[in-house]
């Protein structure tokens, strides 16, 4: 559990000031997130933890894919009212790539590290609840990067709901890959 909490706190302490100073459409934010993703992936590979944390590929049982279809459809919800770009030029590219990296990192530290740590101590039901709520409340840091209070509150509520969905998919499928894709789509389309 301490290991998971370390990564969550470490990520927040580094990401918040970078996002606050540069925004999510900056090449500096993208490079920080890329470096963080490389470090966390390197750690997992070095200690041969890809299987434990669900990064060794898609589930082997094709029936498990049925869980992903509704999630990936819902993940496109931000597009249902039409596509509107938030930035122009390279700023849009950096923002989209940053959002995908944020999804990758958050899936590993919340669904991978935290859920796996809680699973043995708290059991499935409690671990799912704790991770879902923790993930949602974790979005409160967006207040510190300039997001409006009401928008952050709405984001927290949606993040709690998505947190439950994504951790349940990870538990059922034993793979973080579908959650990374779904979370990445949600972030990229927001």
Which residues does each predicted region cover?
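Juxtamembrane "helix-exit" motif on the non-cytosolic side of transmembrane helices
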Residues: 12-21, 77-87, 140-146
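Juxtamembrane helix-entry segments on the extracytoplasmic side of multipass membrane proteins
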Residues: 86-96, 145-158
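Membrane-helix interface segments
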Residues: 61-63, 89-92, 122-126, 151-152, ...
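Structural signal for the C-terminal ends of transmembrane alpha-helices
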Residues: 41-51, 77-82, 171-172
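Functionally important transmembrane alpha-helices
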Residues: 152-190
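Hydrophobic residues within alpha-helical transmembrane segments
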Residues: 97, 101, 130-137, 153, ...
